[in-house]
Each structure stands twice: as structure tokens, then as C-alpha cells.
Amino acid sequence: LQANRQYLFQGSLKPGPELPEEMKQGLPFLGQPDGQGRFPLRYQGRI
């Protein structure tokens, strides 16, 4: 969190075998997975 109340989150999501099938079907909305099966996540905004 910056002094002007802005934030930036960068990370990734790697679905495991325990992830429900319904959630796996929604993963393409996050984009393409990398070579290790991780979906990139990046969010920014102001609180």
C-alpha cells in the first residue's frame, strides 16, 4: 500500500487436483497459463 492509498497485487494461481471442476472451467477467463500451469494475476487500485 502506497502513501496515496494505491495498491498493486501481482501473483499467480496454479490450480491443483482438489480444485472443483466448476472452478477449473472458469480459469480461462484469467488468461493463458504459463509453461508451469500458473495463471498470472495482477490487480491494482485505490483503497
UniProtKB/Swiss-Prot annotation:
Signal peptide annotation: none
Similarity comment: family membership: Belongs to the GSP N family.
Keywords: Cell inner membrane, Cell membrane, Membrane, Protein transport, Transmembrane, Transport
Cellular location(s): Cell inner membrane
Domain of life: Bacteria
Role: Involved in a type II secretion system (T2SS, formerly general secretion pathway, GSP) for the export of proteins.
Protein's recorded name: Type II secretion system protein N
One GO CC term, this protein: type II protein secretion system complex
InterPro entries: T2SS_protein-GspN
Biological processes per GO annotation: protein secretion by the type II secretion system
Any Pfam family matching the protein: T2SSN
